[in-house]
């Protein structure tokens, strides 16, 4: 699989009053920088919503059925897995949140035969030919 960094840059508008409080905490050593504070706050918010997230994951997995590869986090296929799926006549649809990766040495024609569609809220790492075929950014 690709060794690309599994993070994305996000722009957020924060009002001056809130930002000044973050800066006060950073300047006094509570956080190493603004990004550290924001990442900590996001992790805390996700922890607070863990039961909701778990319930939504379960609902999506049940709803997707066996012909869909549903995921959250990081997922993907190696060239070997694509070859095996192709040989067995397996077809799938990829749906998920996070990062989906296909080995860059995957045979594009086999990928097209195996994966009917790819819909990822996040990032897809694959060859330009595969991105173009599925209309991915």
Protein language model annotation of sequence segments:
Residues 2-3, 20-21, 28, 32-56:
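Short, basic amphipathic alpha-helical segments that act as recognition/interaction helices
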Residues 62-63, 74, 93, 97-99, ...:
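Detector for repetitive beta-architecture
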Residues 65, 80-93, 104-117, 132-137:
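Short, T/G/N/S-enriched strand-turn elements that build extracellular solenoid repeat scaffolds
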């Amino acid at each position: 699989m690709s060794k690309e960094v599994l993070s994305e840059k996000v722009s957020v508008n924060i009002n001056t009053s809130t930002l000044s409080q973050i800066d006060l905490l950073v300047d006094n050593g509570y956080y190493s920088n603004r990004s550290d504070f924001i990442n900590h706050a996001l992790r805390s918010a996700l922890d607070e919503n863990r039961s909701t997230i778990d319930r939504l994951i379960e609902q999506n997995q049940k709803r997707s059925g066996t012909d869909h590869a549903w995921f959250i986090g990081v997922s993907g296929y190696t060239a070997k897995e694509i070859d095996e799926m192709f040989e067995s006549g397996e077809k799938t649809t990829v749906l998920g949140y996070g990062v989906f990766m296909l080995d860059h040495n995957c045979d594009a024609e086999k990928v097209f035969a195996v994966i009917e569609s790819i819909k990822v809220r996040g990032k897809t790492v694959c060859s330009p030919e595969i991105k173009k075929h599925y209309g991915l950014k």
